[in-house]
UniProtKB/Swiss-Prot annotation:
CDD domains: NAD_bind_Glutamyl_tRNA_reduct (cd05213)
Assigned EC number: 1.2.1.70
UniProt-annotated binding residues for substrate: 49-52, 107, 112-114, 118
Residues that coordinate or bind NADP(+): 186-191
Name assigned to this protein: Glutamyl-tRNA reductase
UniProt entry keywords in alphabetical sequence: NADP, Oxidoreductase, Porphyrin biosynthesis
Summary of subunit composition and partner proteins: Homodimer.
NCBIfam families named among the record's database cross-references: hemA (TIGR01035)
Entry function: Catalyzes the NADPH-dependent reduction of glutamyl-tRNA(Glu) to glutamate 1-semialdehyde (GSA).
PANTHER family per record: GLUTAMYL-TRNA REDUCTASE
Catalytic activity: (S)-4-amino-5-oxopentanoate + tRNA(Glu) + NADP(+) = L-glutamyl-tRNA(Glu) + NADPH + H(+)
GO biological process, one term: protoporphyrinogen IX biosynthetic process from glutamate
Length: 432
């Protein structure tokens, strides 16, 4: 069954989420390797963003305690706290949750579009490292289709916003950004989004990054209202400007009290990274806003999009039902093939017996074979048609199990590709 263990902004604070975050692929790979050794876990992947850590799996039976215990040991967190906080979804609930995540209905900022890329990256990593097979491939592929439907059939992503844009919106509430210089730390996706929104608000931006070439490339994309420098010069900039937006992948805080000088004017720090980049004391001239502090702005966004969200959840509900109908349909075709294969094997076997016992001349073998197969074909025609008519209907699962039992088909099914996936897992370009 499909299985999901979820830690998000809804059930955990940022301090716990940053401990759980997978800031590098090595840690993610280590965790997936650990949990994939469990006898009940067949496939698994991890989605890790600033607002969530999701463990999505295909399992033989529930195994939340093992997964959570493994996560707790790796991240040095109390297992009991995690078990208490975790939201656990099974089977249709897990698929509905995955579709909601992919469609940005479960995001801190409803309608933000970054999550689709983050899910794609998580899936690609799991496929590349052999943690993800056909079951999760189908689920994720269907999640992308669902997300596309939500985007196309609702206005949920119209004028789409992100955590970065919410941070800039909060900055605009605090001061007029026109012609001001704002420092963006980090040249990744979140940093680029923050820079674009700052420029749109009339500000000029300075990009600081450890990799100077990446900072330069970003500035070239942004245009004339930007400049760049090395992260090594961070202290100089921290004590020269008013607005700072930090979005790096650093495992520990990069802006600390030792870098901050006392100044006479007000400075605003927006920490949009998880784990957090900023660990400084606030005072009358220093204000720090982390991801969770932007909740009020987010709630305004949620109210505006509430009607669209209701429509989107309707789509997700229908797509969840359709997904399980699709799985039942996949199971029907091998049943039909197996019955026909079984009939052919019995016919060929009885034909050989008849030849050995002299009931049939060798010269008549082919004609007899054709006749027997025609009889079986005619006999199986109506059952085959009726089975095909069951496709997409709720009772198909019951009939499938009955047919397996009546015809003793379990062994026959093992040789068939009953789990054919609709896209090539080796081709990452086909994932999204």
């Amino acid at each position: 069954m499909y299985y999901c263990i979820s830690f998000t902004h809804k059930n955990t604070d940022i301090a716990l989420r940053e401990k759980l975050s997978f800031s590098n692929e090595a840690k993610k790979g280590e965790f997936l390797k650990i949990i994939s050794t469990h006898e009940n876990i067949e496939e698994c992947l991890v989605i890790s963003t600033c607002n969530r850590v999701e463990i999505v799996a295909f399992v033989k039976m529930a195994c939340a305690e093992f997964i959570v215990k493994s996560l707790a040991l790796l991240c040095d967190v109390d297992k009991d706290i995690l078990l208490e906080k975790a939201d656990i979804f099974e089977d249709s609930g897990a698929i509905h949750h995955l579709f909601s995540v992919a469609s940005s209905l479960d995001s801190l900022v409803v309608g933000e579009t970054q999550i689709a890329g983050q899910l794609k990256d998580a899936f690609a990593f799991a496929v590349k490292n052999n943690f993800c097979g056909v079951h999760l491939s189908r689920a994720v592929h269907s999640a992308f289709k669902c997300a596309a439907k939500v985007r196309n059939e609702t206005q949920i992503s119209k004028n789409s916003i992100s955590v970065a844009s919410v941070a800039v919106a909060k900055a605009k509430e605090l001061a007029d950004l026109t012609q001001k210089k704002a420092v963006v730390i980090g040249a990744g996706e979140m940093g680029e989004l923050a820079a674009k929104h700052l420029i749109a608000a009339g500000a000029k931006v300075i990009i600081l990054n450890r990799d100077l070439q990446k900072a330069k490339d970003l500035c070239e994309r942004l245009g004339v209202l930007s400049e760049y420098d090395s992260l090594e010069n961070l202290k100089k900039y921290l004590n020269q400007y008013e607005f700072f937006f930090s979005a790096t992948n650093a495992p520990n805080a990069i802006i600390t009290n030792s870098l901050i000088e006392e100044l006479s004017y007000k400075r605003y720090f927006f920490d949009i990274a998880v784990p957090r980049d900023i660990d400084i004391n606030e005072n009358e001239n220093i204000s720090v806003f982390a991801v969770d502090d932007l909740e009020i702005v987010v709630q305004k966004n949620l109210a505006l999009r509430e009607q669209e969200a209701r429509m989107a959840y309707g789509i997700i509900g229908r797509e969840t039902s359709e997904f399980f109908r699709y799985l039942n349909d996949l199971a029907l075709m091998p049943i039909i093939k197996a019955i026909r294969l079984q009939a052919k094997e019995y016919a060929d076997k009885q034909l050989e017996i008849a030849l050995k016992k002299g009931y049939l001349k060798k010269s008549d073998k082919e004609e007899a074979r054709k006749l027997i197969h025609q009889v079986f074909k005619a006999f199986l025609h109506t059952p085959t048609v009726n089975l095909k008519h069951l496709q997409g209907k709720m009772q198909s699962d019951t009939v499938i199990n009955a047919m397996r039992y009546v015809f003793d088909l379990q062994n026959n099914l093992e040789g068939l590709n009953q789990y054919k996936c609709e896209f090539d897992m080796e081709n990452n370009d086909e994932i999204y």
